[in-house]
Amino acid sequence: MSKMRVLFLAVFLMNSVLMIYCDSDDYIRAGYNHKYPFRICSIAKGTDLMRFDRDISCSPYKSNAKMSEGFFIIYKTNIETYTFPVRTYKNELTFPTSYRDVGVVYFLDRTVMGLAMPVYEANLVNSRAQCYSAVAIKRPDGTVFSAYHEDNNKNETLELFPLNFKSVTNKRFITTKEPYFARGPLWLYSTSTSLNCIVTEATAKAKYPFSYFALTTGEIVEGSPFFDGSNGKHFAEPLEKLTILENYTMIEDLMNGMNGATTLVRKIAFLEKGDTLFSWEIKEENESVCMLKHWTTVTHGLRAETDETYHFISKELTAAFVASKESLNLTDPKQTCIKNEFEKIITDVYMSDYNDAYSMNGSYQIFKTTGDLILIWQPLVQKSLMVLEQGSVNLRRRRDLVDVKSRHDILYVQLQYLYDTLKDYINDALGNLAESWCLDQKRTITMLHELSKISPSSIVSEVYGRPISAQLHGDVLAISKCIEVNQSSVQLYKSMRVVDAKGVRSETMCYNRPLVTFSFVNSTPEVVLGQLGLDNEILLGDHRTEECEIPSTKIFLSGNHAHVYTDYTHTNSTPIEDIEVLDAFIRLKIDPLENADFKLLDLYSPDELSRANVFDLENILREYNSYKSALYTIEAKIATNTPSYVNGINSFLQGLGAIGTGLGSVISVTAGALGDIVGGVVSFLKNPFGGGLMLILAIVVVVIIIVVFVRQKHVLSKPIDMMFPYATNPVTTVSSVTGTTVVKTPSVKDADGGTSVAVSEKEEGMADVSGQISGDEYSQEDALKMLKAIKSLDESYRRKPSSSESHASKPSLIDRIRYRGYKSVNVEEA
């Protein structure tokens, strides 16, 4: 480190001297490129140690594959399920319970019972597209009940018609679109009967080994669809529920009713399971199911023979199929079903592609690949070879007829050997090329190892493809990364003569490399002195000198320019492209390998994968939603708005037992009657007559309110006239009340304006009230006496008998019945 510090100090002092004695005309701008930028390469203490690996072994290439031409057909395992049609038959009984009120019928409850249709009725469906309107229900105790459609007690035939809601896989036929709904007696519960025959044309799927099959409606039958009762196929359903008929005639499609086309079924099975009867055609398994399916045909293929296997190569599929050398014999009937198909394919491919130039080299062979694919291989041979072979045989026949067959075989073997030799020669050439390349690489590494002892940095930089500083430390290389300087600050001096401390250029000593000045990146703008090295490497210091050689011409490369120094002075700069290149690179002229775009091989298409599942969830959900929509439409047509209190009270009272049920009937009748009354009033108010009547009543109420208001206002304004109307009578009238005579005389005004009132006679015990009041002033005692007199007068008028009182005194009808035989007594007599 001390030596490095001294070196940098010397460089700094020299740079200071040069800056004093040099001006801008003494240097030029140096060029650079991106591959070799201006850099300082020095070896630090912490470096990486590297070495060349010369222990490389090159194995010779050897191929033991034998190629032959032909084409092949590939079959895959058929994963699709066995699909067949199934019909289901069901009788659906509906018992709706209703309650009838005045003008409305409430739907309370509905009981649905499903029954499997008997076989004899299914025969009627299959032959005439009809079913019966009566159903026999057998209880576990042996009791048989009969139910009739619409409670008509008649067994008739009903026509089947398609349901509006259907899916792709299912078609449903019914006899009753809207369930029968009877209107019972008023204020009583009633139950009616409705029969609906439901026939569904569904699709069933079974998967190998065919131990069960599932319908698209979601129903399952635990048994083989190929079971005929005696062939030993798996069947787990009760055999007493299974009926097998032979030579059965049935309507093929129920869409046209009894006019539909009929078909003859060799064997048909009827299975009663739960509330459904199933029927399907029984077929032979070997005739209906094939376990193999054609996948693809490779019209141009190669077969490479190795020690233990065959490799079937397809350029079209960019794939190779590996199979063992043992060929197969397809004996299973589920596999021999493909024989006619692939023999036809072999004939068609040969006639269309190979008939002109090739001949079949023997019969086809069947192999099983490692991916469980069945491969049928058809070898081919060129006709030109066959013609040559036949010509040689014919020539031999003229000379020697005894040894024809042996020479024919020898000639064929020779021709095949020639083909194999050419093939092996090409393969060996490629192998030798690979081995030679390996040996050349080994020798190149050895040469680089030796050259690294002379110029380690150059060798390592070429190996890594970027500037690297390297130094040989014994038997290993120490490498480090070079430090890049500020590229724009590098300046190349025009003079290569040595300058002493006084600034005088020497005539005898010169620099062997041009001087440059530069600065570091992201540092102070101090200029550092160095010398230009190879590939734009900057060598620190200026101690690399030599004796001047006059005359001399030296060219130094910097970036994309070549700087020419004549007699150690820069004369000009030329582009590096003007200097001719010494081409020492030996190019390998070989065509590149043809592009191979790999194809995505779909062994099974999405449609096949979907058909491989026995349970098709999508179709089952579609069927469920379609049937649910149909039921919703039917229920919407028969359902009515039932008051919530009716169902609530009915459910509560049903929990109380028989007493609660009876009490609930009474309460329901009463509540229904009250509800009808309230509903009648509301309905009356809703019609035009009721609305007009209510408007008239409202007007009458308003008029009454106005009259009462006016009368009340009149009372407030004239209380005496309203409270004592008799006070307005003439004073000349004489009233006798209870033996009292009151004589009223007209009032006479005196001179003072007063009024004199004279009372002639009063009842015994009463004081005479008379006097003359003058003026407008009355004392409180006078006012009190006047009020008492008014009160007495009012009471006398109120005690006067009237016609209404005499009428009210008559006994009522109830009193006369109650007190019959008695006679009323007069009050005076009493």
UniProtKB/Swiss-Prot annotation:
Record keywords, A-Z: Disulfide bond, Glycoprotein, Host cell membrane, Host endosome, Host Golgi apparatus, Host membrane, Host-virus interaction, Membrane, Signal, Transmembrane, Transmembrane helix, Viral attachment to host cell, Viral envelope protein, Virion, Virus entry into host cell
Keyword Nucleotide-binding attached: no
Residue ranges that the UniProt entry lists as topological domain Virion surface: 20-688
InterPro entries: Glycoprot_B_PH1 (IPR035377), Glycoprot_B_PH2 (IPR035381), Glycoprot_B_PH2_sf (IPR038631), Glycoprotein_B_ecto_C (IPR055341), Herpes_Glycoprot_B (IPR000234)
Any single Gene Ontology cellular-component annotation: viral envelope
Domain of life: Viruses
Sequence ranges on the Intravirion membrane side: 710-830
Cysteine disulfide partners in this protein: C41-C482, C58-C438, C131-C197, C290-C337, C510-C548
Xref: SUPFAM superfamilies: Viral glycoprotein ectodomain-like
Transmembrane stretches, start-end: 689-709
Main subcellular location of this protein, as a coarse class: virion
Positions marked as site (Cleavage): R399, D400
Region annotation Involved in fusion and/or binding to host membrane: where it falls in the sequence: 98-104, 184-191
Post-translational modification (record): A proteolytic cleavage by host furin generates two subunits that remain linked by disulfide bonds.
Task performed by this protein: Envelope glycoprotein that forms spikes at the surface of virion envelope. Essential for the initial attachment to heparan sulfate moieties of the host cell surface proteoglycans. Involved in fusion of viral and cellular membranes leading to virus entry into the host cell. Following initial binding to its host receptors, membrane fusion is mediated by the fusion machinery composed at least of gB and the heterodimer gH/gL. May be involved in the fusion between the virion envelope and the outer nuclear membrane during virion egress.
Family as reported in the entry's similarity comment: Belongs to the herpesviridae glycoprotein B family.
Assembly and interaction partners: Homotrimer; disulfide-linked. Binds to heparan sulfate proteoglycans. Interacts with gH/gL heterodimer.
Protein name: Envelope glycoprotein B
Organism: Human herpesvirus 6B (strain Z29) (HHV-6 variant B)
Lineage of producing organism: Viruses, Duplodnaviria, Heunggongvirae, Peploviricota, Herviviricetes
Gene that encodes it: gB
